[in-house]
C-alpha cells in the first residue's frame, strides 16, 4: 500500500484551519502530521478535516503552546506518547499504521535565541530533549517513520549561509552533533536528503521578519522525515512545498512530504 505522509509546523491549527484544509484539498496526502498546533485537543477543529476524508486522528494538545496531531484518511491506532524531559508539554505523539509501521510526530524545542545552556534555559532544555530522544531511539525496534519540526538544520546546504549561522540557534555545531547522535542511535535515514542530496539547497522555514521572504530567501531546513527498520520512501517522492509560504496568513514553515510503500 502506497501512503503519502506530509509534515507541517502550522503555527496554530485553529488560526490556520482553512489553510490546512486548502492543503489537504490540493495535495491530498494520506496522512498529515502537524506541529505547533497551539490548542487543547478538544478545541482542534477535527470536524473540518473529517469532512475532507481525514476522519482518523491522534493528538496531544496544549493551550497556546506546542501541540502535535496526526490526521489520516486510513485507520490509525493510537501509539501513545513520550513526555520528554518530564515537562508535560505536547511534543510527541505516535500512531500505528496499517501493517504495523509506527509513525512518530515530533516538535523539538526551538531553543531560544542564545546558544549557551548556561545562560539560556531554553537552549539547555533543547539539548536535554535531544539527549533523551537519542536514548529513546536506541531502544526502538521494528519499522518506523519519524517526522516533524526538529528545529535543527544539520547540513551546510540546509541553511542560506553556513558561515553566518554557525552561532545561530538551529545550526550551531552542538545542535548539529546532537541531532546526528539521535539519527545514528536510532538507525534513522534522512529521507529528504537521500532523494535530494547536498549541495542542493533545501529550506522548509523562512522567518516572518523578512520584508520579502522569497526575494531574501534566507531559509533553513528545520522539518524532516526519517525512516528506520527497512522502510524506504518511493524514489523521487520527496518534496518541500515552498509555495505554501506565500499563502495568505501563512505559517513560517511549509509542508514536507514523501510517499512510502508499506
Predicted region positions:
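Structured beta-strand-rich core segments of catalytic domains in phosphoester-bond hydrolases
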Residues: 37-40, 44-113
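N-terminal, active-site-proximal structural segment of metallo-dependent hydrolase catalytic domains
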Residues: 1-52, 58, 65-68
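Catalytic metal-binding/acid-base residues of hydrolase active sites
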Residues: 11, 38, 107-109, 151-153, ...
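Surface-exposed cleft-lining segments at the edges of enzyme active sites
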Residues: 108-133, 163-168
Amino acid at each position: 500500500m502506497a501512503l503519502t505522509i506530509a509534515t507541517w509546523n502550522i503555527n496554530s491549527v485553529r488560526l490556520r484551519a482553512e489553510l490546512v484544509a486548502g492543503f489537504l484539498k490540493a495535495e491530498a496526502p494520506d496522512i498529515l502530521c502537524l506541529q505547533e498546533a497551539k490548542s487543547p485537543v478538544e478545541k482542534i477543529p477535527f470536524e473540518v478535516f473529517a469532512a475532507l476524508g481525514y476522519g482518523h486522528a491522534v493528538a496531544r494538545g496544549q493551550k497556546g503552546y506546542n501541540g502535535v496531531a496526526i490526521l489520516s484518511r486510513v485507520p490509525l491506532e493510537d501509539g501513545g506518547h513520550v513526555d520528554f524531559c518530564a515537562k508535560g508539554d505536547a511534543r510527541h505523539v505516535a500512531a500505528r499504521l496499517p501493517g504495523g509501521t509506527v509513525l512518530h510526530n515530533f516538535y523539538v524545542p526551538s531553543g531560544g535565541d542564545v546558544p549557551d545552556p548556561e545562560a539560556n534555559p531554553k537552549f539547555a532544555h533543547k539539548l536535554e530533549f535531544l539527549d533523551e530522544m537519542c536514548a529513546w531511539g536506541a531502544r526502538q525496534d521494528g519499522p518506523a517513520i519519524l517526522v516533524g519540526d526538529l528545529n535543527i538544520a544539520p547540513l551546510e546546504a540546509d541553511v542560506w549561509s553556513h558561515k553566518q549561522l554557525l552561532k545561530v540557534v538551529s545550526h550551531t555545531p552542538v545542535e548539529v552533533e546532537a541531532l546526528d547522535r539521535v539519527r545514528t542511535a536510532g538507525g534513522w535515514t534522512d529521507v529528504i536528503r537521500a532523494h535530494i542530496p547536498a549541495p542542493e539547497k533545501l529550506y522548509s522555514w523562512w522567518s516572518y521578519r523578512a520584508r520579502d521572504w522569497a526575494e531574501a530567501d534566507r531559509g533553513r531546513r528545520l522539518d524532516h522525515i526519517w525512516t528506520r527498520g527497512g522502510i524506504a520512501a518511493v524514489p523521487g517522492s520527496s518534496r518541500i512545498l515552498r509555495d505554501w509560504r506565500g499563502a495568505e496568513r501563512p505559517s513560517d514553515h511549509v509542508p514536507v512530504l514523501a510517499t512510502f510503500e508499506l
